[in-house]
UniProtKB/Swiss-Prot annotation:
Entry protein name: Aminomethyltransferase
Group of enzyme by EC: transferase
UniProt subunit comment: The glycine cleavage system is composed of four proteins: P, T, L and H.
Transferase is among the record's keywords: yes
Role description: The glycine cleavage system catalyzes the degradation of glycine.
Amino acid sequence: MSQTTLKRTPLFDIIAPTGKMVDFAGFEMPVLFSSIKEEHTAVRERVGMFDVSHMGELFVSGSDALAFLQQTLSNDISKIAIGQAQYNVLCQEDGGTVDDLLVYRLDEQDYLLVVNASNIEKDEAHLRQYLTGDVLLENQSDAYGQIAVQGPKAVEVLQELTALKLEDIKFFRFAQGELAGVEMLVSRSGYTGEDGFELYMPSADASAVWNALLEADVVPCGLGARDTLRFEACLPLYGHELSATISPIEAGMGFAVKPQVKSFVGSEVLVKQKEDGPRRQLIGLELTDKGIARQDAPVLVNGETIGFVTTGTLPPTIGKAIALALVPTEYATEETFEIEVRGKKLAAKRIDTPFYRRSK
């Protein structure tokens, strides 16, 4: 895909001069500004911000909206209060994953679904198959910008820009109000393993918010650091830990899958995985030989390929070459493995996940 055909976020014009831009999910996005290590460390120790305006916003409303979402999503939507968010998975009939997403309950009959950039059109088409009754599904992805402000100093820095009492917004809750002079939705959530907020505002206002955050010394961060941060925290990335052939149960997301509570697309398969246990599961590995395992690298036991790496790198906080790997459940308690990297079999040992957990 040539650069001229790539989509651009509302922040492109102010980000492109200082960011190293790459093709990500059909968008021209910054992979880094200074370095992945510097940006990663800024989020772990202070505060950083990410342009995540490429994410999709699908609005669902109507008197049958709840029933529609209960049928199509994995979690129990009836448990979401107005002002609350919930992690969910959109599943295939066979239990494979269409996408993972956040659901915000905006009002009694109004919901916002925030989906992965690479899956916006696919998710919308999948959901439309099940539309019935009084439900309106609107794709308003182009109308909104999204900036994620993440790190232990996020509350302190953002509080200077808003009259909203940010400490009162608990994890996976949100408020609507003015921040940096812009009306927006302020969600206490994120994808880094740190405290932080995801800010949703009209596209036309995104640049003003970004500039206000720059003036407050928030460090601009690219998708490279976003990936190493989420990986250390063992948060799944669609196309890696979740896919059409990897179920949310296999990926360790069973907390968001409620087939015992309700029937939904894929629930017949997933209830069996919950009751009997999945045939595969994700484990953490650390390479004890020198090297870095990347996605799809074969994982071996006793010389036999039994699984594959979903994500692998040498992330800044951990400082060791680690990986997540999908292996048959019967091998998940093995202590030693090999990972094939560039034709060489490198020794690895199983380690606990998540690799990083922030101190409260």
